[in-house]
């Protein structure tokens, strides 16, 4: 969010005066390289699903939704670097109307990436729940039509929320609402998880075992959720500290890691496709076919 980033620049000198922790500055080339890799990897996921009819199922469509979210996060940093480069070359007027509009568009991509990731993980969690505990009715409950409707509503809601957050980003309540979405949605997913694994344990006692493929999907979701929390939580905490205690020495010390937290977000988009490939034999085969055909 432009308001958050500008606020960071304004309080940076104050933070340094109140903390012995120097700001960690990373080369822009690192951000750019990681972002490019993230875009290419997630684009491979989308192409693999698009080219293989065997992968065109609700589960993989939900995975594609998460891949799009990751790709938007990488595109955000690429476009931001391009805007900075043009401004440094004198092609953009600092704080001009075009730059402000471009900043809003880029910031919308960033917010959309976070909201899309949270919502996509929630949908995948619900899909895994139905797969495990309503396996016989799964194909009648989770149809392609319903999956597409859910994804359409999901992205329409995320887009509207993203535009609203960017438009009113200078208001503290908006920042609070933005950061509150993160723990609230994660709480929903974790509650679903606890319920899922408690039922799985109960079912395992009454029956021989749950289908291994279904449990593999649940484990994949667990890994995806863990990586998401690890990569995004530091930034969300940074936003909260920047809003409520920017001059506190301890808060300022943590905020000196601003760029490191940014790299973690970019790394999320790079790690997720490896998780898909490692946990899904079908997707792994599709990746191999794509690589062999290109060679």
From Swiss-Prot:
Gene Ontology CC, one term: plasma membrane
Keyword terms: Cell membrane, Disulfide bond, G-protein coupled receptor, Glycoprotein, Lipoprotein, Membrane, Palmitate, Receptor, Transducer, Transmembrane, Transmembrane helix, Ubl conjugation
InterPro entries assigned: ACTH_rcpt, GPCR_Rhodpsn, GPCR_Rhodpsn_7TM, Melcrt_ACTH_rcpt
Residues bearing glycans: 12, 17
GO molecular function term, any single one: corticotropin receptor activity
One Pfam family recorded for the sequence: 7tm_1
Subcellular location field: Cell membrane
Residues in coiled coil: none
Membrane protein topology class: Multi-pass membrane protein
Side of membrane Cytoplasmic, spans: 50-58, 127-147, 200-217, 279-295
Disulfide bridge partners, by residue number: 21-253, 245-251
Main location, first listed in the record: membrane
Post-translational modification note: Ubiquitinated by MGRN1 that may be involved in post-endocytic trafficking and/or degradation of internalized receptor.
Lipidation (S-palmitoyl cysteine): 293
Transmembrane regions listed in the UniProt entry: 24-49, 59-79, 105-126, 148-168, 181-199, 218-244, 257-278
PROSITE patterns named in the record: G_PROTEIN_RECEP_F1_1 (PS00237), G_PROTEIN_RECEP_F1_2 (PS50262)
Taxonomic superkingdom: Eukaryota
Extracellular side: 1-23, 80-104, 169-180, 245-256
Family from the record: Belongs to the G-protein coupled receptor 1 family.
Function: Hormone receptor primarily expressed in adrenal cortex that plays a key role in regulating adrenocortical function. Upon corticotropin (ACTH) binding, facilitates the release of adrenal glucocorticoids, including cortisol and corticosterone. In addition, MC2R is required for fetal and neonatal adrenal gland development. Mechanistically, activates adenylate cyclase (cAMP), the MAPK cascade as well as the cAMP-dependent protein kinase A pathway leading to steroidogenic factor 1/NR5A1-mediated transcriptional activation.
PANTHER family associated with the record: G-PROTEIN COUPLED RECEPTOR (PTHR22750)
Quaternary organization: Homodimer. Interacts with corticotropin (ACTH). Interacts with MRAP; this interaction targets MC2R to the plasma membrane. Interacts with MRAP2; competing with MRAP for binding to MC2R and impairing the binding of corticotropin (ACTH).
Protein's name in the database: Adrenocorticotropic hormone receptor
Source organism of this protein record: Ovis aries
Originating gene: MC2R
């Amino acid at each position: 969010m432009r308001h958050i980033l500008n606020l960071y620049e304004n309080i940076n000198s104050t933070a340094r005066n109140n903390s012995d922790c120097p700001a960690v500055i990373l080369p822009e080339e690192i951000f750019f390289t990681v972002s490019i890799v993230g875009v290419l990897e997630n684009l491979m996921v989308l192409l693999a699903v698009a080219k293989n009819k065997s992968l065109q199922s609700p589960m993989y469509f939900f995975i594609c939704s998460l891949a799009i979210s990751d790709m938007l996060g990488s595109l955000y940093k690429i476009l931001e670097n391009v805007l900075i480069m043009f401004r440094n070359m004198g092609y953009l007027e600092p704080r001009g109307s075009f730059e402000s509009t471009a900043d809003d568009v880029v910031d919308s991509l960033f917010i959309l990436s976070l909201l899309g990731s949270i919502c996509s993980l929630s949908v995948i969690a619900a899909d895994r729940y139905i797969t495990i505990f309503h396996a016989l009715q799964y194909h009648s409950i989770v149809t392609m039509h319903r999956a597409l409707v859910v994804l359409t509503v999901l992205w329409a809601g995320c887009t509207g929320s993203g535009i609203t957050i960017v438009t009113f980003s200078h208001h503290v309540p908006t920042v609070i609402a933005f950061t509150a979405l993160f723990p609230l949605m994660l709480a929903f997913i974790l509650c679903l998880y606890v319920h899922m694994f408690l039922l799985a344990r109960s079912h395992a006692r009454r029956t021989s075992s749950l289908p291994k493929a279904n449990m593999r999907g649940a484990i994949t979701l667990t890994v995806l959720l863990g990586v998401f929390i690890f990569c995004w939580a530091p930034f969300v905490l940074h936003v909260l500290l920047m809003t409520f205690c920017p001059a506190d020495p301890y808060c300022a010390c943590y905020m000196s890691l601003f760029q490191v937290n940014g790299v973690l977000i970019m790394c999320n988009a790079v790690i997720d496709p490896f998780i898909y490939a490692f946990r899904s034999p079908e997707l792994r085969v599709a990746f191999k076919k794509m690589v062999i055909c290109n060679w």
